[in-house]
Amino acid sequence: MTFEPGARTAWHTHPLGQTLLITAGCGRVQREGGAVEEVHPGDVVWFSAGERHWHGATATTAMTHIAIQEQLDGKAVNWEEHVSDAQYRR
């Protein structure tokens, strides 16, 4: 999946967790209550089951990743509210 510059997911969780493999570009990830982290090709990011988070590109660079998650009772993700511009810029 590729995120164009400035694009990001909404806040969300995964019932069995999620692994991101960053393959190109430069991105940002944030766990609820944590700092925004920058990610680069070769980085592997793990989000624990139920951990609220978002991920996307930086403001100026696209980011591509492979996302791996499993389903629990037919559901792989629980989408929540959009990430505000203020949250994204932190």
Segments predicted by a language model, with ranges:
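Conserved short histidine dyad/triad with adjacent acidic residue
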Residues: 1-14, 49
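Short histidine-centered beta-strand/loop micro-motifs
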Residues: 9-14, 31, 37-38, 56-57
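Glycine- and acidic-residue-biased ligand/ion/polar-headgroup-sensing regions
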Residues: 15-28, 32-33
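Short acidic-glycine-tyrosine-enriched beta hairpin
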Residues: 33-50
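Double-stranded beta-helix
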Residues: 54-90
